[in-house]
A protein has these predicted regions:
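C-terminal motif of bacterial Sec signal peptides marking the signal peptidase cleavage site
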Residues: 15-19
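Beta-rich interaction/scaffold domains
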Residues: 21-154
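Positively charged n-region of N-terminal signal peptides that target proteins for export
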Residues: 1-6, 21-22
Length: 154
């Protein structure tokens, strides 16, 4: 009886290692997109309220209103213009500037983006008074260096 169980177990294992895939399948195309398709910005500040658990001041993040977006895929540039929304308090409106905003962008499917030439990491507060460069690498390995420029109107 034990011998039969071992034989059955070996048979099940042998069948489980068999692949259902056919050989000589066609190769699927690799994503070749290395473009920036949209841009966004936020302003973060320390609010007056405290977090109950820690007692630390609450960090508030509000999205800036995008008023213009010019994307040039051939030149690999994106120019973003943002405005301070009306729901900001007068105190916070006066504090918003390009020295401390958070910028994020949307890129092509399966692409990877890295900062170049000392540019700040996207998604963190940074100085956007000057243009920054980022390399967008497509899944097929092609890389394009993009320049992101931001403008703020109050």
């Amino acid at each position: 009886m034990k011998f039969i169980k071992i034989i059955l177990a070996m048979l099940v294992m042998a069948l489980s290692f068999n692949s259902c895939l056919e050989s000589n399948l066609e190769d699927l195309p690799t994503f070749d997109g290395n473009d920036i398709t949209a841009g966004y910005a936020w302003y973060r500040y320390v609010g007056e309220d405290k977090i109950n658990v820690s007692g630390q001041p609450q960090v508030i993040q509000k999205q800036l209103q995008k008023t213009a977006e010019a994307i040039d895929n051939k030149a690999a540039t994106i120019n973003l213009t943002f405005a301070v929304p009306s729901n900001f308090s007068d105190k916070e409106k006066s504090n918003v500037n390009l020295n401390n905003i958070v910028v994020a962008v949307q890129i092509s499917s399966a692409a990877v983006m890295t900062p170049v030439e000392g540019s700040p990491a996207l998604g963190t507060p940074a100085d956007w008074t000057t243009p920054h460069k980022y390399a967008v690498k497509a899944a097929n390995g092609e890389t394009k260096v993009w320049t992101i420029t931001c403008t703020l109107t109050k």
